[in-house]
Amino acid sequence: MPLDKRQRDLPLGLSPQACFKDIVGRSVLPRIPLPELGKLYAAKLQARCLQPPPFQSLLCSHDKESYGKRFSRSDMRSWCAAATTTTTPLGALESSQKRLLIFDQSGDQTRLLQCPFPLRFPSHAAAEPVKLSELQGIEKAFKEDGEEFHKSDGTESEMHEDTEEINALLYSDDDYDDDCESDDEVMSTGHSPYPNEGVCNKRELEEIDGPCKRQKLLDKVNNISDLSSLVGTESSTQLNGSSFLKDKKLPESKTISTKEDTGSGLSNEQSKKDKIRTALKILESVVPGAKGNEALLLLDEAIDYLKLLKRDLISTEVKNQSSTTHKSPILLLKETTWGTRNLQTDKA
């Protein structure tokens, strides 16, 4: 016959056959009735309050007259009632160590089974603060873990953004790389795999040297732009010096030179604007009737004035050439006769 169904509620799912020992079966002493056993157990609990007495001592202190008697269900019930009605201090029973007892009635015999290790059953009042403290500690641990997780998420997102920007800068020429890959695949078909390894090594080296090369290219571009700006300023100053600064009467040429000497801290845009203004003023002084006009009208008038000067020069050159080559013989004779007359008057 199996044991009672309440054996399923044993702590940690232990089997009664593994964790209980048969006290009555091992003992040589005779059995005692259940009511007397319960009374003895209650008296011992009242005396000690913390630890229950070992059942071996209880079994040794029984009467020999009860040997040979069998326990019935009524005796067991009366023993349980006596054990529950005994007055014991509540705090001591709640916090005391308890051992588990099982009465096995299999067949015609009854056996008393005892757990070899004590079982602690803490009181409800003593268990609550422990649970609350444990819960508070668990909550704090969860909060700290959540904060660390959020911080790690922020750092990971920032690192992810930084890596995306770096990848966008480094691998902006993916199309060119794809073309190279297709060409390499076409070349490597039907050959040994060593060209592919060479391509991979080259690509790794390019990935490593990519930022350095790009930085060098940017530095070169900046240097070229600086040199071009310097060349442009020098050429503009040379043109101004060759065309306008030769005229010593213009006082504005002196101001331009002083500005170029002392205005090193000005920006390129401001210097360009100043140069344009000075050139417009010079054109106003050179072109007749161009004062007070706008910049576009002044430029148109200056262009027309230059065209007129060019035509006048061409016409004067043509007249001079025609006058020297087409002299009449009458004028030559007159000059000769006039010269002879002057000679005769001088002799007289």
Curated annotation (Swiss-Prot):
Annotated signal sequence range: none
Primary location class: nucleus
Similarity remark: Belongs to the bHLH protein family.
Oligomeric form and interacting partners: Homodimer.
Gene Ontology terms: cellular component: nucleus
Biological role: Transcription factor. Involved in stem elongation, probably by regulating a subset of genes involved in this process.
Record-linked CDD domains: bHLH_AtSAC51_like
Annotated spans, Disordered: 179-199
One GO biological process term: unidimensional cell growth
Keyword Ribonucleoprotein annotated: no
Domain called bHLH: residue spans: 260-309
Expressing tissues: Expressed in seedlings, roots, stems, leaves, and flowers.
Localisation: Nucleus
PROSITE patterns: BHLH (PS50888)
PANTHER family: TRANSCRIPTION FACTOR BHLH145 (PTHR36066), TRANSCRIPTION FACTOR SAC51 (PTHR36066:SF8)
Protein name in the entry: Transcription factor SAC51
Gene (name only): SAC51
Keywords assigned by UniProt, alphabetized: DNA-binding, Nucleus, Transcription, Transcription regulation
MF (Gene Ontology): DNA binding; DNA-binding transcription factor activity; protein dimerization activity
